[in-house]
């Protein structure tokens, strides 16, 4: 690597967004660790403030990147036409040149919504947990996770992609282990084992791709490269159709576990229930989307023939996840566990959208990733405040919440309505897009997912009625709220200003994207990406001269 190359790469905005949060978090944790006991107490608030400042700077930079006039980004000219993933942010230099590992980052209409969502959620989670007595390391781990997540979404070298993929496990593991619930050790270990084991399948697929691509012109000792763009420009770079199918299935296992999809979903409810509020918000908001993003980026883009071949398998996985998640939700008494299983159901809808092989369905799946990344963190923030103020997550233990906590009740209603797909909410746009595409592809079979979505509405409305509105009666037959015994004589309270701030932002965005899905150009760029994917990858033979 030349010094000039290093300077160029470090000046790249995507490199800054990836490395600065990681390095900043490590330095802040090191400073706290090296301080004496008295100084550590003094440093906690400044370190927390620096973490939030860095997170806000990353959000500002991500927003500027999204403004076409700022960097001259043309969403329609990427990947398939120019063999590049975006005009802004692409830059590479050799890291381990002898084996074809390079620092190659880029952004396009698939990765940008995920990058922007990540930079949005990180400061919100910090604000929601602003007064949490969890020490200086807590917010630094959240900041470190931001860099790792952005690294996953912008890395175009698959070796570096895998490194960042695994790096995301470390902060989340410690967030659950150190600040989780009573069974946090079990949940943290289960989360790590499941996701790490799944990533081994993905790594095996990456290595097969590495040894089957031709990069002899680079002149390294292997004549191979981990570069995604290079692989993408080589049609069927894996000669054997059978081997391509094997690699596709390896990728599917790895990404479906992360999504997660039934039957490899069992780590998720335990992780959500035991994780702290910030951990659940990031897990549902962004980490689950890594699975869908990776499948679209590597599985669908590089192996289009196999997507068509295994279309039925994708349909089964999506439909089973959608139905199973919805039905299991009906029997849940724990608020967090119910929201966790609803995530499994929504992730099934993403698979169904991809399985339609229609531009609208794929765009709807991507928008579902984005919409769920706003709505689900809102619900987990509500769960966290419910636990914080009422010391319980049991739905049956609380009735008439609106009487004592009107702000919490309002945010809970917005989250539930968005999740069940109420019109004028972001989730509705994604669901309608997927269902229309499903009808275009499979006709009246669309009734199966449509009926399941009605079940989704049922369990949310049922829980909302019991928790927010339904109460008991006093000795004089007057309606009263039923307070949980876990209050131990404490007075019920509404949410704090910082909790309210984070929830308001998410709730407003859920409504804004429901009314105008193309706000900040989001749905348009998703549709462009999906259209080009279908036109140039899935059905290239149908493209005219």
Locate predicted features:
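Transmembrane helix-loop-helix hairpins at membrane boundaries of multipass inner-membrane proteins
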Residues: 2-15, 27-128, 136-140, 220-225, ...
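Alpha-helical transmembrane segments and their helix-start/interface "positive-inside/aromatic belt" motifs
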Residues: 42-56, 186-198, 405-409, 496-506
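Alpha-helical transmembrane segments
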Residues: 51-60, 120, 143-144, 249-251, ...
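Hydrophobic alpha-helical membrane-insertion segments
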Residues: 53-70, 195-207, 505-519
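A generic, lipid-embedded transmembrane alpha helix
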Residues: 55-68, 145, 289-291, 416-420
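Hydrophobic transmembrane alpha-helices and their helix-loop junctions in integral membrane proteins
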Residues: 124-131, 147-159, 173-471
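Short phosphate-coordinating micro-motif centered on Lys-Gly-acidic
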Residues: 166
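Cytoplasmic/organellar membrane-interface segments at the starts of transmembrane helices
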Residues: 215, 405-407, 461-545
């Amino acid at each position: 690597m030349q010094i000039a190359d290093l300077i160029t790469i470090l000046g790249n905005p995507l490199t800054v967004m990836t490395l600065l949060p990681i390095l900043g978090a490590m330095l802040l944790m090191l400073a706290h660790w090296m301080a004496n006991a008295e100084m550590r107490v003094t440093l906690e608030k400044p370190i927390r403030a620096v973490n939030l400042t860095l997170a806000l700077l990353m959000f500002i930079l991500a927003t500027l990147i999204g403004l076409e006039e700022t960097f001259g980004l043309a969403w329609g000219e990427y990947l398939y036409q120019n063999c590049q993933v975006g005009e802004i942010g692409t830059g590479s230099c050799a890291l381990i040149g002898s084996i074809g590992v390079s620092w190659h980052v880029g952004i396009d209409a698939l990765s940008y919504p995920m990058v922007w969502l990540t930079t949005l959620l990180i400061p919100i989670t910090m604000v929601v947990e602003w007064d949490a007595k969890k020490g200086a390391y807590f917010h630094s781990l959240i900041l470190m996770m931001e860099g790792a997540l952005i690294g996953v979404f912008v890395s175009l070298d698959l070796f570096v992609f895998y490194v960042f993929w695994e790096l995301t496990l470390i902060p989340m593991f410690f967030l659950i282990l150190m600040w989780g619930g009573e069974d946090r050790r079990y949940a943290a270990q289960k989360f790590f084992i499941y996701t790490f084991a799944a990533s081994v399948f993905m790594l095996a697929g990456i290595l097969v791709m590495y040894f089957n691509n031709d990069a002899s012109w680079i002149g390294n000792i292997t004549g191979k490269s981990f570069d995604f763009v290079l692989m993408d420009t080589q049609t069927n770079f894996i000669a054997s159709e059978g081997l391509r199918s094997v690699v596709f299935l390896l990728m599917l296992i790895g990404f479906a576990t992360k999504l997660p999809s039934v039957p490899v979903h069992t780590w998720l409810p335990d992780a959500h229930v035991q994780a702290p509020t910030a951990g659940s918000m990031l897990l549902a908001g962004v980490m689950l989307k890594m699975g869908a993003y990776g499948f679209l980026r590597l599985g669908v883009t590089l192996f289009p023939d196999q997507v068509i071949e295994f279309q039925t398998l994708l349909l089964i996985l999506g439909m089973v996840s959608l139905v199973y998640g919805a039905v299991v939700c009906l029997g849940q008494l724990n608020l967090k566990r119910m929201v966790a299983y609803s995530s499994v159901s929504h992730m099934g809808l993403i698979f169904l959208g991809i399985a339609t092989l229609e531009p609208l369905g794929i765009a709807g799946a991507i928008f579902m990733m984005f919409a769920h990344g706003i709505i689900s963190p809102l619900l987990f923030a509500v769960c966290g405040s419910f636990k914080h103020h009422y010391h319980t997550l049991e739905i049956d233990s609380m009735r008439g919440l609106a009487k004592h906590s009107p702000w919490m009740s309002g945010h809970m209603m917005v989250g539930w309505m968005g999740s069940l797909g109420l019109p004028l909410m972001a989730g509705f746009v994604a669901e309608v897009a997927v269902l229309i595409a499903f009808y275009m592809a499979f006709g009246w079979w669309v009734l199966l997912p449509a009926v399941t979505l009605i079940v989704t509405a049922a369990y949310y409305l049922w829980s909302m009625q019991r928790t927010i509105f339904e109460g008991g009666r006093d000795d004089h037959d007057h309606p009263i709220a039923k307070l949980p015994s876990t209050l131990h004589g404490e007075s019920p309270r509404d949410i704090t200003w910082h909790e309210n701030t984070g929830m308001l932002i998410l709730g407003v965005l859920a409504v804004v994207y429901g009314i105008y899905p193309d706000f900040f150009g989001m749905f348009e760029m998703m549709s462009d990406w999906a259209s080009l994917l279908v036109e140039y990858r899935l059905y290239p033979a149908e493209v005219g001269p």
